[in-house]
Amino acid sequence: MDELKKLAGVTAAKYVKNGMIVGLGTGSTAYFFVEEIGRRVKEEGLQVVGVTTSNRTTEQARGLGIPLKSADDIDVIDVTVDGADEVDPDFNGIKGGGGALLMEKIVATPTKEYIWVVDESKLVETLGAFKLPVEVVRYGSERLFRVFKSKGYCPSFRETEGDRFITDMGNYIIDLDLKKIEDPKQLANELDHTVGVVEHGLFNSMVNKVIVAGKNGLDILEK
């Protein structure tokens, strides 16, 4: 599957042209996209400016010699390529399994052409089997946890090596084990209006193309 993920990443890189501002995604498939952009910068003289979606991707891009700018310094991104944890037939998705959902959404929002690269296991009829990440400020997070629990959202604080996971922005993540999300837009609206929630992993109707790596090769889905 790694070879197919690599092929998906390389294919996505073909949408990147000279002079573009490019959003550089995070995750196992987006990794290959960033690697290919780095190769083209070095070997073909590709001239682009990258905007990264995580500290991990920043380190990768710098190591490859890709020029970078902060999201603060740009108004429009030409193309962003990123991964996703689930994608439904309406191009709604869940992201944030790697913990970078806030930066990913900040980069996705001003993007003209937003592309996801995924393997075929990420295509689902209904979102929710993958736990929905919700990034929350630390202050009041225990109360917020109880609110989610009272709603039957089966929350859990994300942990790493026995300690609470802390995002690149210094926040906690509460994962919601919802099993099935019948109305992603309604849930997104609810979370958007919940005090203490910084961002959530529902990316509804944001993506333009999904490049799918499957056992039979690549499939490019478009709206």
Swiss-Prot record:
List, in alphabetical order, the Gene Ontology terms for molecular function in this entry. Answer: ribose-5-phosphate isomerase activity
What Pfam family does this protein match (any one)? Answer: Rib_5-P_isom_A
Catalytically driven reaction(s): aldehydo-D-ribose 5-phosphate = D-ribulose 5-phosphate
Q: For this UniProt entry, which residues form the secretion signal?
A: none
Q: Which residues form a coiled coil?
A: none
Give the UniProt record's GO annotations in the biological process aspect.
pentose-phosphate shunt, non-oxidative branch
Q: Which UniProt keywords apply?
A: Isomerase
Q: Where is the active site?
A: E104 (proton acceptor)
Q: Does the keyword Isomerase apply?
A: yes
Q: Which domain of life is it from?
A: Bacteria
Q: Is Manganese among this UniProt entry's keywords?
A: no
Biological pathway: Carbohydrate degradation; pentose phosphate pathway; D-ribose 5-phosphate from D-ribulose 5-phosphate (non-oxidative stage): step 1/1
- Positions contributing to substrate binding: T26, G27, S28, T29, D82, G83, A84, D85, K95, G96, G97, G98, K122
Per the UniProt entry, the Enzyme Commission number(s) are 5.3.1.6
- Describe its partners and assembly state: Homodimer.
Task of the protein: Catalyzes the reversible conversion of ribose-5-phosphate to ribulose 5-phosphate.
Q: Per the similarity annotation, which family is this?
A: Belongs to the ribose 5-phosphate isomerase family.
Identify the HAMAP family for this entry.
Rib_5P_isom_A
- What is this protein called in UniProt? Ribose-5-phosphate isomerase A
Gene name of the record: rpiA
